[in-house]
Amino acid sequence: MDPTLKQLARSLREAPVVDRDGYEYFVHGVTDGVPPLDPAVLEAIADGIRERIDLEGVDTLVAPEAMGIHHGTALSLATRIPLVVVRKRSYGFPEEVAVHQETSYGESDLYLNGVDAGDRVVVVDDVLSSGGTIEAVCEALEAVGAEIVDIVTVLRRVDADHGDISRPVTSLLDVRVRDGALEVVE
């Protein structure tokens, strides 16, 4: 395992798992903002992303609200690449693109602003589960004519059906829920 991610892996092993209408959902600072996320772990996440993807020539980082925001922000601060947040509410701007997302545990609309045709973007999110959020964000980006350079998540649930995503995704760590506990898969 990458030494920069060992602290993240240790903290994940402590994450409680809750049942959310039949979906086993783990609760961690990376994915939920609680418990508090150690700044050293957040910095290690940004470093891990920088080590795994080519950010040369990227114009914009794109992070879905809500839990992609802090990972996108940390990466933006580390790279000086601007960040756009795909919001869960509309501002009604003329160039706004609305898309519908369906995830393992719900559905909603997302709204993209601030990305233009020809922009080279990297999508940053917390976890790949069904892929519904990432696929919706990518559809919005393609609708405005952006070039998706890479998609990166901090975590990938290997026990989930990624059937909603049709694109390659880079992840820092693989995890699964087994017997009511979160495991890091090495």
Swiss-Prot record:
InterPro entries: HGPRTase-like, PRibTrfase_dom, PRTase-like, Pur/Pyrimidine_PRTase. It is an enzyme of class 2 (transferase). SUPFAM superfamilies: PRTase-like. Pfam families: Pribosyltran (PF00156). Its EC number is 2.4.2.-. PROSITE patterns: PUR_PYR_PR_TRANSFER. Gene3D superfamilies: 3.40.50.2020. Keywords: Purine salvage, Transferase. Belongs to the purine/pyrimidine phosphoribosyltransferase family. Archaeal HPRT subfamily. This is HGPRTase-like protein 3. It comes from Haloterrigena turkmenica (strain ATCC 51198 / DSM 5511 / JCM 9101 / NCIMB 13204 / VKM B-1734 / 4k). The lineage of its organism: Archaea, Methanobacteriati, Methanobacteriota, Stenosarchaea group, Halobacteria.
